Amino acid sequence: MKSLPPEMRQILGDCYPHIRELNPAQRSAIEAGYLESEDNYIIAIPTASGKTLLGIIAALKTVMEGGRVIYTVPLLSIQNEKIKEFRKLEEHGIRVGKDPRTSDIAVMVFESFDSLTRFSWNILREVDLLIVDEFHMIGEYTRGPVIESAITRARTLNPSVRIVALSATLSNMDEIAGWLDARVVEHDYRPVPLHREVLDTEMFGVREKNDVVLKVLERSLEDGSQTLAFVSTRRFTESLASHLADKISGKIPDDMVESFREVAGKVLEVPKSRGSPPTSTCLKLAECLEAGIAFHHAGLFNRQREIIEDEFRDGNILMITATPSLMYGVNLPSRTVVIRDYTRWTSQGPRRIPVFDYEQMSGRAGRPQYDDAGYSYLIARSHDEAMDLEEYYIRGEVERTTSRIIENRDALYRQIIAQVASGLSGTTEELADFFRNTFYGYQMVEGPFSDSFGMDSIQYEVENATEYLMRNRILYPGPEGFSATEFGLLIAKSNYSVETAIKLHQFASEMDEMDIYRLIYEITRTPDMPLISFKGRKSRDPVRDKLMEHGLFLMDVGNEEATAAALIEWINERTEYEIENAFHVYAASTRRSAYEASKIVKFFGKICEIMGVYRHSSQLEILSARLYYGVKEDAIPLVVGVRGLGRVRARKIIKTFGEDLRHVREDELKRIDGIGPKMAGAIRRYCERF
């Protein structure tokens, strides 16, 4: 810390009292001129090695000099985590928030920052420092194109902005640094040494990989540590957790039994608090938790996932079995990481996970301040396979990071629309110039694998994409270049994919009368809709039958159809328990799917308006509300008008008193289960107003 200015040392000492000295990786950055220089920097150091503190040091320097900072992250969960961490700075007069207009340090998700670069140029031009956390995601299919395009626009509109990229180590760092015009600080320091090993069934004389995981768990139980186990699918998270819980339950020390039961009780309370009995998935989770094992996937209630994460941090869970998506969204280090599955299913069949993903999962092992070492175990079926995996993953090199902006066609279309709608590009030449400045363009024209046809390739991709957008009436050509149609402007100002917009536009053009059930089904077929998935291979006839009841005759039944059936039941006030039992789906995610469907219905309404179709507006507003609140039409005024009432209590009120509540007294309302004096008063005030 001695190398930092006194005022900065004071702030950091107050906000991060556990940090006494900079670690070797942080010192190497300071010694490389990171604090004094205005150059762009890529900080490439391992997980948990202090990247965030280096970001804060740069941010403090900028704010102390009167500047503004935007700190970008990939996910809302990380945004909330960072804001909570940075709030300590407010004690020193530094404003922290999500809005760059009112914050000295604004924490934004990538998509929000991308939107800022399109339409909020004045704000962007006031930003002095852009910090890009999890920058290594620039090679990821979905978010990578967003990162590189937003950075490119930001540098075009505000050439003086300084960029600090916080990243894992990438194999082609020099190439990436060339694009960013950045200096690179790489260091292999880890606060907790990491031991990586491949285990196989033959070592332990067992037949199944699950039994190898059990051996690791038993060792963790002996030394009082915790384990994260990664598998490839939701179903495997549950089957592994159940297997381990069954095997370990008789070996749990008495002093742990009660705390495990308390955690199990907490997850069972979640559906009850939402008016639903626990689903079979909830019951299975609670049963596993009584043995200290949790499974973690998107098919659980959000609150249940939060409980699992918090209790794991507090040491009240021995092991979490999870899919690899956990490594991106949640900061959950543990002493031991087990990677049971090293393949994932693709359209071409099973494929090995990248070395980069293996590194990210392994990097979770070892908790700073708690562990003297971290242990990562990859599981193989045989000794020969173990040797192969050791060569591939432990000794192998991380793959070269490449731009995905052309591979992800929707990302290409969205960035072209953004450029045209914002007035930054109007011709194919100007669009090609924009893409020339992206990471994709740098790799095509200046990278080590570039060739003399790089610019021609960019021009070709742009021309193909603009033709597609003109065919779909998103762009139209004029004497001075392209302009965005009303439809194109709507897409540019939304967060929806071009494919979603085109599908909904097509449906609106073919629709004579409003059929809300057909609309729900069409929404589930858009790529922006989070789907509710089947739990196993049980009969799918109940889903087919439910859709047939509402005039939807379908031969093939998959997750899209399951989601449509679940949403139809949701707006008819069925509980998650009833939906799961009826259709054999992960119904805990119904609420999230319904929320997203509600927003897509509003987007569909805007599409109808720009097409001049207004006769469905009222029905669409009603459907959006029904999806959002999960109610029949008669309950909408009550759940909308009385904040926090919820659909269960609203239905009890309507059943008891009918829809006309003008003459119902507060004492009568309080007789209904779940309604206390405060809520009764709120209901009366609502009735008096309306």
Swiss-Prot record:
Enzyme class, spelled out: isomerase
InterPro entries membership: DEAD/DEAH_box_helicase_dom, DisA/LigA_HHH, Hel308-like_dom4, Hel308_SKI2-like, Helicase_ATP-bd, Helicase_C-like, Helicase_Hel308, Hlx-hairpin-Hlx_DNA-bd_motif
Single biological process term from Gene Ontology: DNA repair
Top-rank taxon: Archaea
Enzyme nomenclature, EC number: 5.6.2.4
Domain Helicase ATP-binding as annotated: residue spans: 32-188
Motif DEAH box in this chain: 133-136
Resulting phenotype, residue 647 to A: No change in DNA-binding to replication forks. Basal ATPase 4-5 fold higher than wild-type, ssDNA stimulation is less effective than wild-type. Almost no helicase activity. Binds RPA
Subunit structure as annotated in this protein's UniProt entry: Monomer. Binds replication protein A (RPA), in presence and absence of DNA.
Protein's UniProt name: ATP-dependent DNA helicase Hel308
Taxonomic placement: Archaea, Methanobacteriati, Methanobacteriota, Methanomada group, Methanobacteria
